[in-house]
Amino acid sequence: MFALFYPLLNEQIAIANILSDLDRYLYNLDALILKKEGVKKALSFELLSQRKRLKGFNQAWQRVRLGDICEFGNGEAYETLIVENGDFKLISLNSIDIDGNLKNTMKRVNFYDNSLKQDDIVMVLSDVAHGDFLGLCAVIPSNDYVLNQRMGRLRIRNDCINILFLRLYINANQKYFKMQGQGSSQLNLSKKAIEDFEIPLPPLNEQIAIANILSALDHEIASLKNKKRQFDNIKKALNHDLMSAKIRVLKK
């Protein structure tokens, strides 16, 4: 048996209204995120497949192999060298989220091996059977990262490639990499499968224009998701405080 404590009816109603308002706000945020993600997916398909051309661009696109425009490299096994407060961030399998962005928290090491430089692209080379992360890419923002095993590195060979465009195109075509995964309980990507991936490549100025549009949508979606996480935490804390009478709803 346990005792149930509850406020007077008017305070019950006030608490319910506050939490219901938060629920409605979170629901609307979810709907907005889904809408923005749908817009981004549709626009990515149209822009990256040439179904829609941006105004002022009409030059032909060139079909290229990923291996011809990028140098591919593998990471090393550094799990035994991980330290709590290392100076360098270790790029591992769990360093990239499902949206193809680097996570804020990752393991660290105390050495730099020149495996990664600013503007390199890192790719997930191994995943469990569903393969949802296989081939996902993110861009390295600075020179304080080290590449771990089962992660790949793409480094552009010339200045005619925009790294943001390349990352967007690879992530929009992740189905190719999932199909190329080899194995049963764990899928792995081969160097050949990665280098043979073909990309329709527009002139550099069009790459930049496309990347700017889609990256702006990515930033907007990421901002909305961050706001959603913040309000989820607010609701959780407020729910606890109101239901435990730590915070009382006072009548004005």
Where are these regions (language model features)?
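A short glycine-rich beta-alpha junction/loop motif
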Residues: M1-N10, Y145-G152, Q182-N205
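Non-catalytic DNA-recognition/assembly elements of restriction-modification systems
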Residues: L9, L54-E76, I98, D196, ...
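Generic structural signal for buried aliphatic residues
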Residues: L19, I121-M123, L214
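A short beta-sheet element
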Residues: S92-N94, N110-N171
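Short amphipathic coiled-coil heptad-repeat segments
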Residues: A14, D21-V64, S223-K252
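Sequence-specific dsDNA recognition surfaces
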Residues: G67-E79, S92-I121
